[in-house]
Amino acid sequence: MPKTKAGDHFESLFEYAPISLWEQDYSGIKSFLDKLRASGVANLDTFLNEHPEEIDKTLRLIKVTHVNRETLNLFGAKTEKELLANLDKMFRDEMRAHWRSELTALWNGEFNWSGDGVNYRLDGEALDIRLHWRILPECESTWECVLVAIENITALKQAEKRFRNLFKY
């Protein structure tokens, strides 16, 4: 199907946005959480305390459908294929607590979330990030289309640390 002029415009807005943007599919996470509810799980926090390995399992259920150019730049990838092949290097360690908070929001029926965390570039450099996601209105029943924005706040966090250190002594 040929693209419309408006479609080209919105694709360019996504592709050239000056912030890391991701299109993701959380339908696998929705199925996982729905099955937990159906099995009688009433409290996700209690369940995750008893089964912490499930946090990693749900991370693997995220499907990344597209990222923009700034995402490649931020994470040091040359291509989307390279980036997607290395997600386990980028989202690790401190990310689990961050993701747990996101899972809790999803469990509680929230369609958008924001929070700070740590991701890693492909070269291993840590990035302090502010992550925002929104399940798009047309996908609120399936969670198949989620827009994710990642802002690099490393310089801000370093400045905050220097500021706090000024007043320690």
Predicted feature locations:
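PAS-family sensory domains
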Residues: 65, 97, 113, 120-127
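PAS-family sensory/regulatory domains
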Residues: 69, 73-75, 81-94
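A short beta-strand signature of PAS-family and PAS-like sensory folds
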Residues: 26, 100-105, 115-119, 133
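Conserved hydrophobic beta-strand signature of PAS-family and PAS-like sensory domains
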Residues: 30-31, 37, 45-48, 61-65
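N-terminal capping loop/helix in small sensory signaling domains highlighted by a polar->aromatic N-x2-3-F motif
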Residues: 25, 34, 41-44, 68-71
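PAS-associated C-terminal cap
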Residues: 1-13, 151-165
